[in-house]
Amino acid sequence: MTIIASISKIGNIKSSSSSSIGSGRNSAISFGSNKIACGECGGSSNPMGSLIGNVANTGAGKVSHIPVTVMVDASVAMNPSSMLPSGGSCGCN
């Protein structure tokens, strides 16, 4: 299941939205170290699976690594701890 999230403007990073937010294979989000790589930038599956989600494919677009504000994973309803801490926002240039 995917969730739809809107991305707020931070500095010169443009606002955007995505329907593929989450930790699945086609996710636009990569989890790890309380940061995410976000935007329609593609990615590749990660051996660690749902633990950190997909790995950003830098060849598919410019990815901005910025602390996430509140990113809710598709599994957050069953596992509230999958919500990342407050920080900032994200986007792709």
Swiss-Prot record:
What InterPro entries does the record point to? HssA/B-like_chaperone, HssA/B-related
BP GO annotations: sorocarp development
Supply the Pfam families for this chain: Coiled
Origin: domain of life? Eukaryota
Family membership noted in the UniProt record: Belongs to the hssA/B family.
User: What name appears for this protein in its UniProt entry?
Assistant: HssA/B-like protein 23
Q: Which organism is it from?
A: Dictyostelium discoideum
